[in-house]
């Protein structure tokens, strides 16, 4: 089939909930993607932050092939070694006590919400507790995760959602205080807001929130589904701030391309929250996906990938800062590590489309006016130079 035939067949059978670009990707190698016409694209989106190693990494692929030949599913009624190994590695890496594996980031958020509510229920002896979330946040599209997503246009068609959620202003501690009540059981936030526009948390703000949560026995939930897994210059972004969460959600690059997420708990919460019968999943923690998690964590360590991010990020950031200086419609840059955004005063959707269809560059948007870059963590200076050439050509067409 040619490209248009693929697209026509997709529209016949797939529910149209994404406005997809007219490109049909066929395979990838390194930091490049190739469509069905064998056109090469530079990928600075990495499947929305998923493909940390890029495409076609043989070590990763061989680990999955090996597990496929052994066993792919048992259900959570039984133990299996890939899940046990992945749990040990992930809890150690994150500095937390227990983990529950899910199939996605949104499922991890659902588990975090349930954990916080159950913790407060056991402590107080009654339900009806509240959660403080952040304006302009994004935590997923399931009912629970959408309930704590602070972006109206995602929420409005599905109201009423879960009640007891209040929204505070990110990086404004006074807004936390204004929304907190005796019923508050948790505060949830992204350490770097992604979909909302690439806003890193302020260090003083996180410390104030942590101290407040400690005083009030409120659980602090960090959503690092997008900003975690090395992207910001540490395995998890919170590790740069010296502020520990009570609950952590993670996904995307955690599995290197297979659908897996997780929520992790500290010891206090793990001992006073979910018990058998409270939470479960048929596929979560299956042997194939947890073998992927284990392999990903091993490769992060063996490749010293976080060190590489810290080495390449300044070079990439310097290129982005040059673009801010060069083009009047590029107002500013913000971000952390290899999670970067350029604030534009021209329609960002037009820029993303032009980059893809005219210059074979895959980038993303965020927050309405931000050009978002989430390149594979393995990018080199040569890849950044290629990005610079392509994005300069894109921006020149908007002068």
Model-identified regions with their sequence ranges:
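Conserved N-terminal phosphate-binding loop of PLP-dependent enzymes in the Aspartate aminotransferase
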Residues: 1-399
